[in-house]
Structures are given as structure tokens and as C-alpha cells.
């Protein structure tokens, strides 16, 4: 593979905030990678109040060619003005990397050749925008809860998947730590994401936006571990707030989708958020009345999609309960 030695081929985005108990696992997952190309990890500590920054300094000293730290003295996420994303975007741009990988500070990689396998796939097929893999699920202590989560794509079949396929997946999401995407159309992607910016939904909107530029390849291998962390942003947000945010974000995503996805936009406006809202608000009975009108509209506009989404959600809920 021809490589410009002035720039790493891959840049890893790693956001850290009070991840001290888990951070070594995360950073070890970076430095064990076996590749025939250079890569860097932009590790951004958002003014942690624990010893996360000390751990990052330790690894940056030991692996200066890989670990590229950013230390904040003021928490950027709490500003809610996009500062956190802008800092990371500037750092990624400065690397000149061709591909971007992702891993939050409380998750970690388990496969030493994860990056190499993903790069090989992207280099071989220019129609691909990203490569995603499966993940295991662990608890706060690192105990494996699920060896292979599954459901990343329909029937776990390895291959290429479109945006339409994404909306038909059982999980309706990709494991963040498993994703590597092509670093192209950066300004257009950021403009689209700015229109849909919302902290409740993690990278859900990013997957959708990336899909509008190309297919995802699903590599049917476990390369990462997703940690169930009750102190993470998505676990600490109140259910009512998340339900309302999901409706807002579905409408925003519908606004930015290209015209060939008009049917998906219609589904997003009238059905997709309904099931998620029901799940987020299931302990708040009064919120159901707030959604009755929208439910009726969804039944009129997109009955098949509504019933499909609800049946998929019920199936996921039953499978999750069966594993407990």
C-alpha cells in the first residue's frame, strides 16, 4: 500500500471524561494495533475531575507516535455550543488522515488487526463510505455480558449495506467503537450534522449522514467491547427528555435527507420516533397522551412502517429480557 509518510493513514477520535476506571483498556486497544501504515489517536480529555488526564499523559509519553492528547481546562461538552466537536474536528483535520476511526474512553478494542482489516476493505472498494463490525458487551468491571451482540445488520450477514438497509436493521444503530469511515466531504457532513445536532442520540445521525455518501460494509467479526456504563450521557438523560429530543431529531434528519429518500423522511416524521418515545417514556404514563395524536397520524401515513418498527422493538425487548 502506498503511503504518504507525512500523514497517518488513520486518525482515531477518542473522547474522554472521567473514564479513569476504564481508560487503560481503551488506550491499550489503540497501541496493540498491528498495521502496515501509521495511525494516531486524538485523545481529548474534557477537563476530567478524576485521574483520566494522568493516564493519558502516561500513554502519550510511552507511545508519542500514536497517542496525541488534548487537555481541556474547561469542560467543552457542558457549553452545548458545539465546542467539543470543533476541537476534535480541527485536530482530525490537522492529521491529514484518509480514514477516521472512533472509540469512546469507556469502550475498547479487542482485535489487534481491527484497523488493518477495515483499511484493507476501504482501499479495495471506493464505493464504501465506512466499515463496521460487531461488538461484545461488558459491564463496569469488564465482565462479558454478551460475547457477540449481533443485530448490527439483518441476519448478521457480512457484506455491503445501504441507508435503506440501515433503517431495516434490528438494532437501528452501529457500535460506535467499531466504525471506521472515509474522511471525505468533511465540511458537507459537518454542515448536515450541525442541523441535526443533539446530545441524546450519540452518533445515530452521523451514521445516517455518512450513509448518504456511500455504503457501509459489515465485517462479521467482534473487534470491540461496548461497556454498559450507568454514568454515561445516554444512560443519565431523563426518559421524557430523550423522547422529546428523539422526535425533534427525527424531523431534523428528515429535512436533510436527499430527495431519493423521501419515503424514509416520511417514515422518520411519522413513525420512527414513536416506538423509541414509548420506550423512553414507559414509566411516565401521562406522556402517552402527548403522543396519541402522532400515533394516529402515523397509522394514517405509514401504517406498515409503524407496525414494523413496533414489532422490531418488541422483539428486541423480549430478547433482552430473555438474556437477563
PLM regions with names:
Residues 113-147:
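Conserved donor NDP-sugar-binding/catalytic core segment of glycosyltransferases
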Residues 22-24, 50-59:
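Acidic helix N-cap motif at the loop->helix transition within catalytic regions
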Residues 73-95, 117:
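Glycine-rich, basic loop-to-helix element that forms the pyrophosphate-binding segment
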Residues 100:
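Short aromatic/hydrophobic "clamp" motif used to bind/position activated sugar donors
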Residues 85, 93, 133, 151-239, ...:
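Conserved nucleotide-sugar donor-binding catalytic segment
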Residues 28-38:
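Short, acidic, metal-binding catalytic loop of nucleotide-sugar glycosyltransferases
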Residues 45-54, 74-75, 104:
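A conserved acidic beta->alpha catalytic loop
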